Curated annotation (Swiss-Prot):
This is Large ribosomal subunit protein uL15. Part of the 50S ribosomal subunit. Residues 1-52 are annotated as: Disordered. GO terms for biological process: translation. Binds to the 23S rRNA. One of its GO terms (molecular function) is structural constituent of ribosome.
Length: 144
């Protein structure tokens, strides 16, 4: 058996109807388009959602869905456990960027509580949640 000798099974391939080839073909004269009207003409399609000039459904209904705000691209929340990776005890935005915990676009950082933390750190110019603040102060850290 070779690829060039393989042929489809009998009656598995039907030849397509040739339109506009006489009355006897069943698709002659108007070629299955009916008589007159926009859809019988060449290029006579209407765009998706078009309702004949009536206000379409997608414009009658209100908009919905959630669009991510631009602010979210510049904000980040960091768990306290992330600071265990940093050797510095003084932490601010520059130190976080240097240690690749946040990317260069981030401008606002909030520190949130997590259990795996036991280090004295000094935080400057970062937002801190209530529980994270308690935890930092418990281990002798400060927040400016």
């Amino acid at each position: 058996m070779y690829l060039n000798t393989i042929s489809p099974m009998k009656k598995s391939n039907h030849s397509s109807k040739r339109k506009g080839r006489g009355i006897g073909s069943g698709k002659g004269k108007t070629s299955g388009r009916g008589h007159k009207g926009q859809r019988s003409r060449s290029g006579g399609k209407v765009r998706r959602g078009f309702e004949g000039g009536q206000m379409p459904l997608y414009r009658r209904l209100p908009k919905f869905g959630h669009n991510k705000s631009k602010k979210s691209f510049f904000k980040k929340e960091i768990k306290l456990s992330e600071f265990m990776k940093i050797k510095d005890s003084f932490i601010d935005l520059i130190v976080l960027k240097k240690n690749k915990i946040i990317n260069s676009k981030i401008k606002i950082v909030k520190i949130i509580f997590s259990k795996n933390f036991n280090k004295k750190i000094n935080i400057k110019n970062l937002k801190v949640s209530k529980n994270a603040k308690k935890e930092i102060e418990f281990f002798g850290g400060t927040i400016n």
